[in-house]
Amino acid sequence: MNIFRFLGDISHLSAILILLLKIWKSRSCAGISGKSQLLFAIVFTTRYLDLFTNFISLYNTSMKMVYVASSYATIWMIYSKFKATYDGNHDTFRVEFLIVPTAILAFLVNHDFTPLEILWTFSIYLESVAILPQLFMVSKTGEAETITSHYLFALGIYRALYLFNWIWRYQFEGFFDLIAIVAGLVQTVLYCDFFYLYITKVLKGKKLSLPA
C-alpha cells in the first residue's frame, strides 16, 4: 500500500468520525443529508459483498467493516435516534436520478459481466455523485455548520488523495483502472467549488455558504 492510499483512508476515516461525533455530541443531525448517507450505505454494501469471501489483508477487511458499519450507524442516528432533528424539508434531492443512471452505466461499462463486478462498478459510479444531495442541501439552506464543512472537506481530500494513489499505482505497478480514475475525477470536480469556499471562508473563521 502506498502513502497516498493510506492518507486517503485516514482522511476518509476522519470524515466518518467527524460526522458521527458531530451528530452524537450535538444530539442533532441538522444540516446533514440523510439521502447522501443512504447513498453511501448503498455504495459500501454493494462494493463489499465479498467481505467474507475474498480476504486480502486484515487492514483491508477491517476498513471494509468500518465503512459498512459506520454508514448504517449514521443512517440509524438520522432516521431513528435523532429523527426529530432531521431537516427533511431541505433534503429534497431526487436520488433516483443518481441511482438509476449509475446502475444502467454499471451494466454497460464494467470490467467483467458478473454480479459482483457489476455491483462493484455500480458502487464506484454511485460514490462519485453520492455527495450531491448534501451539496444541494447546503445550497438550499444557504450555509453549513463549520463541523459539517470539516466533514465535507475531509471527504473531498480523501477522493483527491485516491487520484494520486491511482497515479502512483500506474507509475510503479503498471496498474490502470479507467473506471475508478474517471469516477474519482468526477467526484473531485464536484468538490472544487466547495474547496474554494472552505479555504477562503471556513479557514478564516467564517461560516460556509454556497450560492443558491
UniProtKB/Swiss-Prot annotation:
InterPro entries: ER_ret_rcpt. The record marks D193 as: Important for recycling of cargo proteins with the sequence motif K-D-E-L from the Golgi to the endoplasmic reticulum. GO terms for biological process: protein retention in ER lumen; protein transport; retrograde vesicle-mediated transport, Golgi to endoplasmic reticulum. Signal peptide: none annotated. It is a multi-pass membrane protein. Disulfide bonds: none annotated. This is ER lumen protein-retaining receptor 1. Belongs to the ERD2 family. Residues 204-207 are annotated as: Important for recycling of cargo proteins with the sequence motif K-D-E-L from the Golgi to the endoplasmic reticulum.
